[in-house]
Amino acid sequence: ADLCAKGELDGNVNDFMTLMDDHMDEIVVHPAITERLEKACASTDIAGYNYMTARYEMDGELYPNRVIVGSETYPPEIARNWDLVEKLPHVIGDFTWTGWDYIGEAGVGVPAYQWGEGGFGAGFPCQLAYSGDIDITGFRRPASYFREVVFGLRKDPYITVQNPHKFGQHLIKTPWVISDSVSTWNWSGCEGNPAIVEIYSPGEEVELFVNGASQGKKAAGKNAGFRTLFEVVYEPGTVEAVAYENGQEIGRMELQSAEREVHLELEIEEGRAKELSYIHVWLKDSQGRVMTDCDKKLTAEVTGDADLAGFGSGNPKPEHSYNEGITETFHGHALLILRKSEGTESCQVKIKSEDGLSVEASF
C-alpha cells in the first residue's frame, strides 16, 4: 500500500504476486491448495507443479503414488529444485521458466533499480521477457551456466560480475531474476570502485584472483548453492576463478578486459532452413576479446537476391523494430537474419556503426 501511495506500484495483480513471492512456500502448502490438487491430480499420470517446490516432500508423504514434475520453476531456485529431484524418487525432473527468451510478458526477468524499470510493470520500450537461459539471439546467458554447474555437467567455474555502476543500490527482482550480473571484466568508469563477482562453481571451494592477486577462498558447490560472491576492487586486467575438490584443482575460468579500440566482426551461421542465414555481429578488440561496455548503434544494408528478415540484439528494451535494419549492440553483440530467395546467386551484407566502423560480407 505504501508503494502504491508513492506511485512506485500501480497495484496490478502481477506487482502483487512479485511482492508476495517471499510467502509463496507458505501459500502453496495451504489446505485449500491441497484440496484442489486432489481433484486435478486424480486424472493425471504425472502431476505438473508450477512454482510449488515446497510441496514436493509433503506430497510424497501424503500421496505415495503421485509422480511429480516441476513443470515451471524459478531460475534462481535451480539448486534447491535439482537437489529435490535427485533426492526424491517421485519427483522426476524440472522445467525452468524459461529456456529461450521471447517477446511478451515484457520485463518479467528484467532487473531494476526503480519501480517500472523491470518486472511485469516495465514500461516502453521493454518488449522481451528476459527470463531465458538463452537470449532471443541464441546467446547463452549466465543462468544457463549456473544450471550447467548445478546439473554436474560443468567442472570449470563460471564468472559473472554484478553491475558495479549500481554497487550498493537495492536491486528490485522478480522471482525470475538471479541478479544483474554479466560475464565480463569491462566496466569503464568503475576503476578503483567496489564490485561483486558472482561465481557459479562446482567443488568444495573456489578461489578468486584479480590481476594475479588472490582474493581468498570461499565455499562453493552444493553447500553454497553453487553460487559464491566476492567483493573486490575493480581494476582492468584479468579476473580468474579456480575450483577445488579435496584440495585439488578441478577447473578454472578467466575473464580479460578488452581494449577500448574495437572493430566490427561477422560470424556467419547457416540455418537448418536453407533459406536463412544468421549473421552474428560482434564488437571485438585486436585480440578478439568482446567489448561489452561501449555498445554502438548499427545500420544493416542487404543487396542482391536476399532480404533482411530481422536485425536485433538480446536487449529486452530495443528502440527499433526487428525488421527496421537498425539496432544497437547489447553487451557487444547483435544478430542479423538473412532470408535468401530460391535460386539465390549472390547477395551482400554491409553493417555500419554511427561512429564510422563498417564490415561487409558476400554470399
How should each PLM-predicted stretch be described?
Residues A1-K274, S286-Q287:
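Substrate-binding clefts and catalytic carboxylate motifs of secreted carbohydrate-active enzymes
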Residues N12-M17, G312-I326:
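Acidic/polar low-complexity surface segments
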Residues E205-A213, D295-A309:
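Extended low-complexity, serine/threonine- and proline-enriched intrinsically disordered segments
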Residues K218, H263, E301-K317:
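Short aromatic-acidic-glycine turn motif
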Residues T228-Y234, N323-E342:
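Short, hydrophobic beta-strand segments
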Residues E235-V239, S277, G343-C347:
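Exposed beta-strand face motif in extracellular beta-rich ectodomains
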Residues A243, L283, I351-S353:
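Conserved structural position at the C-terminal beta-strand
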Residues N246-G251, S353-E360:
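Short, exposed coil/turn segments at beta-strand boundaries within extracellular/luminal domains
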